[in-house]
């Protein structure tokens, strides 16, 4: 039986990076979580980011198991490397990437489940000015990206696709989901609560 996604899930695993055009990530989805975006100010305090209508800007955190075919780096901070097959990593999607995920979910044709496969391949980049507005045309080669002065901000974007999970990767992703969301039980826990916790599995 497939496990529907939507519960809160916040492990601190390495984040998949987009550092060059042509990088591929393939993963089995373990869980997803929406959260409000924040930005650290000059005083070191994080403040919420809001849209023009006053609503909070959001991002999507997708926890995955790395599948074969991945060559995109992952890491936390400056420590990055190509993850091994089976490693747990996170995709952090915001802005256009978040919108692309929503479209990919619609194209999947059903509710996303643990073990479904996400495929991401970086295919373009965009230079932004100091105010965060796009500057010039999208870039499509790494040579163009490398020629951009370091003083300018470059965002690298990817095409994203969701596919139904298959075989052992569903089993592995479901095991990871259960391990991460397990609720410790004590001797004083009410019997009805124990039954409710076990019911979905």
Residue map of PLM features:
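OB-fold/S1-family single-stranded nucleic acid-binding modules
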Residues: 119-182
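Short nucleic-acid-contacting surface segments enriched for D/E, G, S/T with interspersed K/R
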Residues: 98-121
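Short, structured beta-strand/loop micro-motifs enriched in basic residues and often containing a Trp
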Residues: 87-103
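Positively charged, low-complexity intrinsically disordered regions
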Residues: 91, 151, 192-194
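Acidic, gly/ser/pro-rich intrinsically disordered tails
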Residues: 1-9, 161-201
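Hydrophobic beta-strand residues in large extracellular and virion-surface proteins
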Residues: 27-32, 60-66, 89-93, 112-120
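OB-fold ssDNA-binding interfaces and closely related basic DNA-contact patches used
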Residues: 1-84
């Amino acid at each position: 039986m497939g496990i529907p996604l939507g519960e809160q899930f916040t492990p601190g695993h390495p984040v998949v990076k987009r550092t060059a055009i042509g990088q591929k990530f393939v993963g089995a989805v373990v869980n997803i979580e929406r959260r409000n975006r924040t930005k650290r100010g000059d005083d070191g305090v994080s403040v919420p980011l809001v849209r023009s209508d006053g609503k909070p800007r959001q991002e999507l955190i997708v926890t995955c198991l790395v599948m074969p075919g991945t060559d995109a780096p992952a890491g936390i901070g400056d420590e990055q490397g190509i993850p091994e097959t089976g490693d747990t990593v996170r995709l952090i999607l915001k802005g256009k990437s978040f919108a692309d995920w929503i479209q990919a979910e619609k194209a999947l044709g059903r509710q996303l489940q643990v073990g479904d496969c996400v495929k991401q391949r970086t295919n373009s980049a965009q230079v932004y000015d100091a105010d965060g507005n796009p500057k010039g045309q999208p870039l499509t080669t790494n040579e163009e990206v490398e020629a951009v002065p370091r003083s300018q901000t470059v965002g690298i974007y990817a095409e994203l696709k969701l596919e139904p999970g298959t075989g052992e990767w569903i089993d592995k992703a479901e095991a990871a989901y259960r391990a991460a969301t397990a609720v410790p039980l004590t001797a004083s826990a009410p019997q009805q609560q124990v039954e409710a916790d076990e019911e979905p599995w």
